[in-house]
Amino acid sequence: MCCFRGLTQRTTELRADKPTHAVLAVALLVLAGCAGTPARYPQELAAQEQALAPRWYAPPLPHDGKTTELTQWWQRWADPVLADLIAGAQELGPSIAAARAQVEAARAAVAGVEVAGRPQVSAVANAVREPSIELPLGTTLSAGLQASWTVDLWGGNAASVRAARADEASAGAGWHAARVLVAAETAQAYYGYRLCLRQLAVVTDDRASRERTARSNDITEQAGFTAPAVAALARASAADGRNRQAQQQAVCEQQLKGLVALTGMSEPQLRQQLSEAPPLPGHGALQSMLSVRALPADVIRQRPDVYRAQQDLMAAAEGVHVSQAALWPSLSLSGNVMRNRFSGGGTDITLNSWSVGPFTLSLPLLGREGLRAQASAAEARYEAAARAYAATLRQAVAEVEQSLVAQSSLAARVEATATAVDGYDRSLRATEARYRVGLANLNELEEARRLKLAADSASVALLQERIQAWIALYVALGGGFDPRQALSQE
């Protein structure tokens, strides 16, 4: 390491020889020429966004529904119970707490990097008791301020600050993503449980139908009008109905336990709150919960994972700048202002002193291979971040398009399912009318009833699929994340 030093103490004149001035001037010119390393970050972002498709390759949403702010999307469900459960889950969610801790750690890192790049001032105090040439023993006391500063010649410190701020923004986006996922998970569990109860009602009606058929066949078997094998089959069908009901009831109870774990509420309190929930939304209410009219590049900017990948790319780009800055000389200076007192041998002297220097210009000579290796590693991290950003963009577009395809398919199934439910309902009413006048037996009536119940079960399952698909689209669209307010909303 080579150093150039100049020192002044208790004088206003700074002395340095002409060769030192020349070396300093040449070094500063070299540094100025190398300080303007062009940043590739903006060009990389523009190139990756231009590579996106100019339009969505997926069916549009039905009825071209009105665009709604995603931040207020849960209010469209008009379900205060759901809103309370989401709030409770977000308050207790460990993933949100972990993401929040990452935000605080990133903020602390920003503060540390910013302070490290500024002039440092410390209060110092010294006490020395020792013999001197003139006196056998003396005490020297001093107190004052000591300052030091490493000059940011080509922006390495500034790049470190920008990288730390990018990490902070990335952590903030991660916090928003965690909140969106917890809200979606809670909503899916909530509607999953309520639709499970509706499915349980269908299964319970099916069990009752099978048991009525079994009892009818037992009576006719005893009267000699039904073969024993037919009666045995009816009893087996009734047992199967009881088995399905018990299985469905267990599924519902398990889902309720999951909701208890998510929200932190006691089970009796949660059951009471669920009993006050409004009716489930119908297929008609789900026709236009969201619409996607904007271009892909505009939509995916609202996703926290895309914003996080952008900030990671920026941090990697600034890391390249920092690693390159370490290869060049650094300039530092220091100084102090002191109040001194000497006493000993009957002498008591008080005086003030100050110093400026040394000015140190240092250039690493040995071990530069390690610095070059660190610069190469920073370049590799930047390339990896660029690839990750491109992959995040592609995955974001794919998730939105997959959600749109799912919505289109489910919407097409609504009409067919409604037709099936209506047809089986008409058949059941006709069979009941025939049964009342003796033109149909009980077995025919119960078979028509079971077909109707199966259609009802399919309708409930379709409703659950549609609700889950809407929630998936909400997550795919970013869940109301706004990069301009990524940190202020916390």
Predicted features and spans:
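N-terminal secretory signal peptides that target proteins for export/translocation
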Residues: 1-17
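Terminal intrinsically disordered/low-complexity segments used for targeting and assembly
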Residues: 2-4, 21-91, 165, 249-301, ...
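Small/polar-residue-enriched beta-strand and adjacent coil segments characteristic
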Residues: 80-81, 85-88, 100, 107, ...
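Long, contiguous alpha-helical "rod/stalk" segments
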Residues: 95-110, 114, 417-421
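Amphipathic alpha-helical coiled-coil segments
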Residues: 96-99, 164, 171, 189, ...
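Periplasmic alpha-helical coiled-coil/stalk elements that build and connect Gram-negative outer-membrane
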Residues: 157, 173-295, 406, 410, ...
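Alpha-helical heptad-repeat coiled-coil segments that mediate oligomerization/polymerization in large
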Residues: 224-227, 396, 403, 438-441
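Hydrophobic, well-ordered secondary-structure elements that form the walls
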Residues: 333, 361, 378, 385, ...
